[in-house]
UniProtKB/Swiss-Prot annotation:
It is found in: Cytoplasm. Acetyl-CoA binds at residues 353, 359-360, 378, 396, 413. Residues 224-244 are annotated as: Linker. It catalyses: alpha-D-glucosamine 1-phosphate + acetyl-CoA = N-acetyl-alpha-D-glucosamine 1-phosphate + CoA + H(+); N-acetyl-alpha-D-glucosamine 1-phosphate + UTP + H(+) = UDP-N-acetyl-alpha-D-glucosamine + diphosphate. The active site is at 336 (proton acceptor). One of its GO terms (cellular component) is cytoplasm. This is Bifunctional protein GlmU. PANTHER family: BIFUNCTIONAL PROTEIN GLMU (PTHR43584:SF3), NUCLEOTIDYL TRANSFERASE (PTHR43584). It is an enzyme of class 2 (transferase). Its cofactor is Mg(2+). Residues 245-430 are annotated as: N-acetyltransferase. The keyword Zinc-finger does not apply. In the N-terminal section; belongs to the N-acetylglucosamine-1-phosphate uridyltransferase family. In the C-terminal section; belongs to the transferase hexapeptide repeat family.
Length: 430
């Protein structure tokens, strides 16, 4: 059966208390809406996103990441509510799945369950130990027969633990017939998507309950919800990676972006952050180090090292308090307290403690090129643009501000001198 997906993302999300649209708040490095789109793309090639609040901003970000997404603007002034969002929406396939853009935790398996079978409507249902505050979904003989608001429940209905999770898979022809019939004769003057369930039941149509996990279908409406969803997503990511062979020390202290990838034997120590689309191959990241959007192979970083976006490290050791930015290091050792930015460093080179690439003049960034087997002594400043050829020794404390040819010693120290008895002249006799 072919499936179309409609994602509701028009809401303002006032409870977020943020100028950022609710659906663009990130979970594990990716906007919530993108998680919903990713899930939808696993089952459908016809995806429509419903927008209203900050629609241009959201559409621009989605189009930068995805192709062939259809956008529909909700006329929220005349047709508010979830049902109003569907006014004027048309989909290609025989069945339409309606998702919420603020549910980033839904899995493919749940969407497949919701879109299987031949019921006119499949309705997501959660069982809650304490359903207080929720309307109850009344189910008889494995069919939904009624949705009752809590204030209207009788004593028996109040004991019902089944509630609406808010996701529906509907026969498209039926949906297109029901949506124009929706009315807003309620206290909020909104058009509710739940009314299509009542229409179907009244017509004797089959509304099938699909039981789902609360964890997956929990909407994110506040910063507290966002933090809780992040915890769940992080747990999933790390459990999957550990099952695939990644070693983690105190995984609850580690953060991993959902776009990061790992190959071979990788180890992450406590407090590590892997951000962006980082790629790690046979690499050891030591405690409290940060890796951002970079490629690392057969390397180790830290403790307390930082590799910033655009870097490539192969067979390289980056030690404590070393920062690397947009640099290509192959077979390099940089053990302590250095900044390497916009650099290319060749095999066998050693970067001493306190070495700095001076890559920025206040207006522009410049490159530092270091060849193979170069020894850069401690407290050296490399003033870019500069090129150091192979087999060079840079003496400690040198400021390199011009190119260095192969095989030489570069040194720029002033001669040391001593002043006799200066201590006693300065402090007096002790």
């Amino acid at each position: 059966m072919s499936i179309s997906v409609v994602i509701l993302a028009a809401g303002q999300g006032t409870r977020m208390k943020s100028s950022t649209p609710k659906v663009l708040h990130t979970i594990s490095g990716k906007p919530m809406l993108f998680h919903a789109i990713d899930a939808a793309k696993e089952i459908s090639d016809d995806i429509t996103v419903i927008l209203h609040h900050q629609e241009e901003r959201i559409q621009k970000e989605v189009e930068a990441e995805y192709e062939n997404i259809i956008f529909h603007r909700q006329d929220a002034k005349n047709f508010p509510g979830t049902g109003g969002a569907m006014k004027g929406v048309y989909t290609r396939h025989e069945r339409t799945l309606i998702l919420n853009g603020d549910m980033p935790l839904i899995k493919k398996s749940s969407l497949e369950a919701l879109t299987s079978g031949d019921a006119d409507i499949n309705m997501s249902i959660i069982r809650l130990e304490d359903p207080s505050g929720y309307g109850r979904v009344i189910i008889e003989d494995d069919k939904v027969v009624e949705i009752v608001e809590q204030k209207d429940c009788n004593e028996a209905q109040l004991c019902t633990q089944t509630v609406n999770a808010g996701i529906y898979a509907v026969d498209t022809a039926l949906l297109e017939r029901y949506i124009p019939l929706l009315r807003n004769d309620n206290a909020q003057k909104e058009y509710y998507l739940t009314d299509i369930v009542k229409m179907a039941v009244d017509e004797g149509r089959t509304v099938h309950p699909v039981y789902v996990e609360e964890e997956e279908f929990k909407g994110v409406n506040s910063k507290l919800d966002l933090a809780r969803a992040e915890e769940i997503m992080q747990r999933r990511i790390k459990e999957a990676l550990m099952m695939a062979g990644v070693t983690m020390c105190l995984p609850e202290t580690i953060y991993i972006d959902c776009r990061a990838t790992f190959e071979g034997e990788c180890e992450l120590e406590n407090g590590v952050r892997i951000q962006g689309a980082a790629q790690l191959v046979n690499t050891h990241i030591k405690a409290h180090s940060v890796i951002e959007d970079s490629y690392l192979k057969n390397s180790d970083v830290g403790p307390m090292g930082r590799v910033r976006p655009g870097s490539k490290l192969v067979d390289t050791h980056i030690g404590n308090f070393v920062e690397v930015k947009k640099s290509d290091l192959n077979g390099v050792k940089a053990g302590h307290l250095s900044y390497i930015g916009d650099a290319q460093i060749g095999e066998g080179s050693n970067i001493g403690a306190g070495v700095i690439t001076c890559n920025y003049d206040g207006k522009n960034k410049f490159r530092t090129i270091i060849g193979k087997n170069v020894f850069v002594g401690s407290d050296t400043q490399l003033v870019a643009p500069v090129c150091i050829e192979d087999d060079v020794i840079i003496a400690a404390g040198t400021t390199v501000n011009k190119d260095v040819e192969k095989g030489v010693l570069a040194i720029s120290r002033t001669p040391m001198r001593t002043v006799k008895n200066f201590f006693y002249k300065f402090f007096g006799d002790k």
